[in-house]
A protein has these predicted regions:
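Positively charged n-region of N-terminal signal peptides that target proteins for export
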Residues: 1-4
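Repetitive helical segments and hydrophobic/amphipathic motifs
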Residues: 11-12
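N-terminal, motif-rich segments that launch catalysis or mediate targeting to/interaction with membranes
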Residues: 19-126, 133, 138-263
């Protein structure tokens, strides 16, 4: 278990500014989680991180750009089998690394401080990643590895415009980008207002069932987006509701997980 984190621990003190990969989205998920964490969990997290949890939510992204830890790039993706089930035992799969990091936290009294710190940062980040639909891949479905599509404003004559968009950009930046002039806490509050009535239902389950749940969303969305036809902007906007739901699930589930680990 320790082997998979050894390079991370070795570089821990060397990592500086995180490279941007929807940092605001991860920070918002962490901010939402903090709203529902117990005082004990918050205290434990603060003691381990010695930094703000919201800021540290993007730490794992910086490792994939370090030569010694470039292998962690694959950890950000989650694979389902052809039946949409999370059965993988692959060492480089996100859900496997998440489970390993959770195990370290549960056994933290017997682990080094560096390993526990790296594991907590890994948990915070990967719970966010698994709720980004472009990070879920389904065996036998090449479209889940990413694709481009064309969008139109449906204007007439000179007012008509069309442009290329991508599956990755849709889930990672399109909707989050509208809120980046606010604070993560403000965006988290906005998401909470929208989704709080379903919080109890959303926070149930395990990391593997959460990925499977996301896979169901992927399967529903693909037929409408993986097409050679022009897609009206109105259709794209409808997916903001789905995106907000995914963000809410991530925040609520992260809080529930950390509350359980640090109970």
């Amino acid at each position: 278990m320790k082997r998979v984190f050894i390079a991370i621990v070795a570089l821990f003190a060397l990592v500086g500014e995180s490279f941007a990969f929807i940092p605001f989205g991860h920070q918002t998920i962490a901010a939402l989680a903090e709203k529902y964490m117990t005082n004990k969990a918050k205290s434990e997290v603060q003691t381990i991180l010695k930094e703000n949890m919201t800021d540290e939510s993007v730490w794992l992204n910086s490792l994939r750009n370090q030569e010694a830890t470039a292998y962690t790039k694959d950890w950000h993706f989650f694979t389902l089998d052809v039946n949409g089930k999370s059965t993988t035992a692959a060492e480089n799969d996100g859900v496997v690394q998440l489970e390993k990091a959770i195990a370290v936290l549960r056994n933290r009294v017997n682990e080094s401080d560096s390993l526990v710190s790296a594991s907590l940062r890994t948990v915070i980040h990967l719970v966010g990643d698994m709720h980004c639909l472009s990070h879920i891949r389904i065996d036998g479905n090449e479209a889940t590895k990413g694709f481009d599509y064309m969008v139109t404003n449906e204007g007439v004559g000179k007012n008509h415009k069309s442009w290329k968009a991508s599956w990755y950009y849709l889930w990672e930046r399109t909707f989050v980008g509208r809120y980046t002039f606010f604070t993560p806490q403000y965006y988290a509050d906005d998401i909470d207002i929208y989704a709080n009535s379903k919080k109890s239902a959303y926070e149930q389950g395990t990391p593997r069932s959460w990925v499977e749940n996301g896979g169901e969303d992927v399967v529903r969305a693909l037929p409408h987006l993986h097409t050679t036809e022009l897609i009206p902007t109105q259709v794209i906007q409808l997916y903001e509701f789905n995106h907000t739901k995914c963000m809410a699930k991530a925040g609520y589930r992260l809080a529930a997980l950390l509350n359980d680990v640090f109970k």
